[in-house]
Amino acid sequence: MITNWDSVAWAFNDFSIDSVIYIQEATLDDWEKVITFLNENDSLVFEVYNYEDFDPCKTTNQIDREFIFQSFSNHSETDDNAKAHFSLNGLEINCFFEFKDQIELCFQAGSVKSIDDYKKVEELMIKLSTLLNRMVTLAYEGGVVFPLIKVDVTRGIIEVVDEKKYENRFYSLKYRILSLQSKFLEIFFPEKNRIMWVKIHEDDYLPKKIKDNAW
């Protein structure tokens, strides 16, 4: 259990970005357990919304397993989508069912303002790690490979990355090479440079293997 707010406050000081609790390499069995767990929350609201205008076309207080599992096996861009929203002692959390192999619980980073708020997040991560018997991480949206916090109850791990280490991630050899490549393309092929960064940004939001994580 992290008890020093100063050691984690830096990770929650931005209202413009979402923090995400990630469960990587998830299985349908993991989803089944998480859906059952979330359905036990009295504040849960499950919405199915129209893909064209994002207006809710179905709202209930329980996640529809059949709809979610069907969407995993046969989903197109023109199908309706779904999300679940619940309150965790005042912390507002959303779950979007985008990927079969990665579970994501999102909340506004800046809503965690104290050690008490942080404990709510950590306790949720501990419950999920215990429930699934696997590692659970927290990272910024689109940054799953750079965890801020790791929790693995089985291995006795509750760790927060050092702020300086996190900031230095862009000084790795991989990113230095990418930076040089980008500078070259920007001078001679600016459109290719733009396309490259669009693809990188899109790829950041796709599921990642645990082995791809920076630590």
Where are these regions (language model features)?
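Long, contiguous N-terminal structural blocks used for assembly/anchoring
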Residues: 1-66, 70-71, 215
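Short Gly/Ser/Thr- and Asp/Glu-enriched loop/turn motifs at secondary-structure junctions
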Residues: 16, 100, 142-144
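Short, intrinsically disordered low-complexity segments
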Residues: 45-107
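Short linear motifs in intrinsically disordered
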Residues: 11, 65-76, 125-130, 186
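Catalytic micro-motifs at enzyme active sites that drive phosphoryl/nucleotidyl and oxygen chemistry
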Residues: 7-10, 91-94, 125
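Acidic, proline/glycine-rich low-complexity IDRs
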Residues: 1-3, 107-215
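Solvent-exposed loop and beta-edge segments used for protein-protein assembly and interaction
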Residues: 13-15, 99, 130
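Short, hydrophobic/proline-enriched secondary-structure or compact coil segments at domain edges
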Residues: 17-25, 101-111
